[in-house]
Amino acid sequence: MEHYDWNDGWTFTPVFDPAIVRPECPDLPLTPVRIPHTVRTLPYNYCNENDYQRLCGYRREFFAPKEWQGRTVLLTFEAVAHDATVFCNGRRVFHHGCGYTAFTVDLTESLRLGEQNVVAVRCDSREDLNIPPFGGQIDFLTYGGIYRAVSLDVKEPAYLRDIFIEAQAEGDFRIYTSTVGETVGCTLQAEIRSPAGSRALYSGELSLPIVGTLNGVHPWSIGHPFLYTLTVRLIRPGTSGLPDRVLDEKSTRFGFRTLQFVAGGLYLNGQRVELRGLNRHQSYPYQGYAMPDSIQQLDAQILKKQLGCNAVRTSHYPQSQAFLDACDELGLLVFVEMPGWQHIGDESWQAQALQNCREMVCQCRNHPSVFLWGVRVNGSPDDEAFYKRTNEAVRRLDPTRPTGGAHIRRKDQLLEDVYAYNDYSYTGRGAGCENRSAVTPDLRRGYLISEFGGQQFPAKTFDDEPHRLAQALHHAAVLNDAIAQPGVAGSFGWCMADYNTHREFGSGDRICYHGVLDSFRNPKLSAAVYASQKTPRSPSDIVLEVSSSMALGDHPGGFAGACWVFTNAESVRLYRSNDFIAEFSPDRRGRFAALPHPPIEVQDFVGSLLEKYEGLDPVVAPQVAAILNEMRRDALSLSPLSRARLLSLRLSWNDLLRMYYKYIGVLGSPSSVYRFEAVWHGRTVRTVVREPVQSVRLECTVYNPLLTDGPTWDCAAVSLRAIDQNGNFLPYCGEAVQLSVEGPVRILGPSVVPLRGGMAGTYLATTGRAGRAVLHCKMEGALDTEAVLTVRKRS
C-alpha cells in the first residue's frame, strides 16, 4: 500500500486543447499550477461570472515504476468543478459530473510501467451543463477548477473500497465494508482505537457486518466531541506455514452517539439540543472555492469558537472533508445538503442528482458531526417521484440519520423525516418566525428553520450605525422566537459570511451582503448576537459589543437613538466621564427573553448626575432624568404625561434643554467619555471605551501564522482593521492599505486593498519553500505594521 499526494507538478491551460491528453504533447501554452487551483481569480466585487465559465485543461506527467506490475493504481480527486473527464496516456478512463463530491479513477489498465505517463483532466465549469446545481438561476457563484486535493494510491488487486460504522452512544456498533477484486478466502480485522490510545480488535467475514460492543465508551457530543479511530484490514490467510498477509487497510474517525429527530426537536444521546447555527458557503475573495484545508478548518473554528454556533448547514452542496473533520473535532453539528438551488431538471439531470446524493452519503456518513441529510434541492417545488428516490437512496445507505430538505413554501409534500423551512417572514415587526403548525403538513415530524435573515435585512460593514444595528436585532428576534416556539428544533441564520453571486442577486456589485461576517470573515455587529449566546466558562469567553459609537452625527437630527449591548456577562455598568450612571442586566421578560443571553438596551444615560451636578432633590432628579432619557430616545419629543410632569416639577423647557445638551446632547459641552464594563462573577472582566477618535491604528491579525507547505500549498488568513486608541474599529475609515511580503509566501489578490467599513483582509499562500515570512502593511495616517509567519516544509 502506497500513498502519494498529487498536488504539485500540474500544468494548466484556460482553453482545452485535445492535444493536452496525449503523451507526446505539442508545444501548448501550459502554466505550472499547484492544487487547489481556480480556473480564474476574480476581483473582490463587480466580478463577471462569465470569466470562470470555460472548458479548460490540466495535465500531469509522472513516472510509473515497474514495481507497480500486478498492483492497482487509483487516482482520487476530492473535487473538480464541475464536469470532469480524466484521460491517461490519451485514453479516456473516467467521467464525473458533480463539482462537490470526490471520485476515484482506476488508472491500472492505461499505465505504461517503467515509462513516463500522462494524466489529463478536461474540466468544464460552464453553467449550461445539464447537472446540478445548474439549469436555473443560482444565488451564488460556482467557480471552476481542481479546487480540492488530489492523491494517488497503489494497492493490491483486492482492496477495500469503503468502510462504514454505525456506533451508538452505549457502545454498540456495526461495521460494514465493501471490497473490489478477488477476495475469496479473505477475512477482515477491525481495530477501534480510543481517544486515550487503547485498542480493541474484532474479526469478521466479508459477507457480514462486524457487530460488537465496546464497553466504557465516551459518547461524542457538542461539549465533549470524543473521536475514535476505526481501522479495517483486509487479510488473506497464510498457507503452507506462511503468515497472514494484509492486502489493504482503511481508517476513519467516528464517534459513538445516538440521534433522534422527533416532533419535540433533536436529541443527541438522549439530551435535547437547541440548534443555533448559520449557513456556510465555501467561497472566498479572489480564489472562489480554491483554498487549502487549513482555511476550511478555520471557518469551522470561527463558527464554533468565535460565533458560538453549535450547528452549520452546508448550503447548498457537500463541503470539504477538512471542514467536516474540524466540525467533528469541535463538536459542531452539520446539516449536509445535496447540490442545487430551486431548479429540478430532466431525467438525465435527476439521475446525476441521485448519484450526487449517494456520493454525499458514502463520503460523509462516518462523520459524527453530520446529523441531517438534505435530500431536496434547496427551495425547489414538490416532485414526488424524484424525492421518493432521493429519500430511499439515502436511507438505504445510512439508516442512522434523518432526511430533510429546505422548503420555501408552506405545506409542501413531506417525504423527509424533518421539515426544514426557509423562513423569511420576519420584516422587523411581529413574530420572528412563522408558527410551525401553519407550515409543516405533519406535526408528528421534526421541524427546523433552515434559513432566515439574509435577503430580508442585508447589511454592509460600511452601512450607517442604525442599519447595522437593525440587522443585528433582526437576527436576535428570529433566534429568540425560534427558541420560544415549542417543536422548533432550532434555526440557521443566512448566513455566515458575505459571498459573491450572480447578476440577478446581491447589491449590484455581485456580492450578497447577507453575512454576519464580511467575505474575509471580519465580524459585523450581527456577529455579536451569536457570539454573545455562548455560555462563558472563563473571563476570556465574555463578549461585550456596544452597538453605538456614541457619535450623535451618525443619526438623523443628531439624536443618537437606541444603544444596545450584546453580551453574555451578568450585567453591564455604564460610566460617563468616570461618573457612574447605571448598571444594566438582561431583561428576562422582554423581547429577547428566550435567548440564553438577551441583548441589553441601555436606556439611562443620566443616572444620578442631576443630584451630583445640578443639586436636584433625590426625589425630583430621577423624574427629570427619565424625561431627559425620553428626549434622547424620541428626538426631543415628550409624551403628554412627561409634559405634565415637567409642569409639576416647575421646570421650563429651556431648563430641560440646557440639561439635555449638557448631559446627553453635549452641544456646547466638552465631549464625554463613555465606559461600558462587563460584570461576571461580581467583577469587571471586559471594558469598552467610547470617546472621540484621537489616533488611528492599523490592526493586522494573522489567524494561522504557522504554515505547512505539503501535502498542498498552505494559506494564512489575514484580517485588517482600522481601530482607535481604545481598540474600537472605525467603520468609516476607507483608507488604502499597501501590502508587501518577504520570504516564502505570496499575496493572493491585489497588493493594495481598500478598507471597507474599516475592515479588509488578504491571504498569504506558501510557495513550496520553508522559512520565515513577513507581511508589511502601510496605511496613510497610521504607523506601519507587520506580521511574522513561519513556513514549514513537509514532503
Language model: regions and residue ranges:
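Accessory carbohydrate-binding/adhesion or oligomerization-edge regions at the termini
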Residues: 1-43, 122, 472-479, 521, ...
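Accessory beta-strand-rich segments of carbohydrate-active enzymes
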Residues: 3-16, 38, 49, 53-160, ...
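Active-site-adjacent substrate/metal-binding segments within catalytic domains
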Residues: 37-64, 68-76, 81-88, 94-97, ...
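Beta-strand-rich binding/interaction modules
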Residues: 88, 172-204, 561-583, 674-678, ...
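Extended acidic/polar, glycine-enriched regions
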Residues: 112-116, 178-260
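Substrate-binding/catalytic cleft of secreted carbohydrate-active enzymes
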Residues: 174, 302, 311-528, 533, ...
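Beta-strand-rich structural segments
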Residues: 175-178, 232-234, 563-567, 714-731, ...
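Carbohydrate-binding surfaces of carbohydrate-active enzymes
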Residues: 483-706, 723-725, 733-734
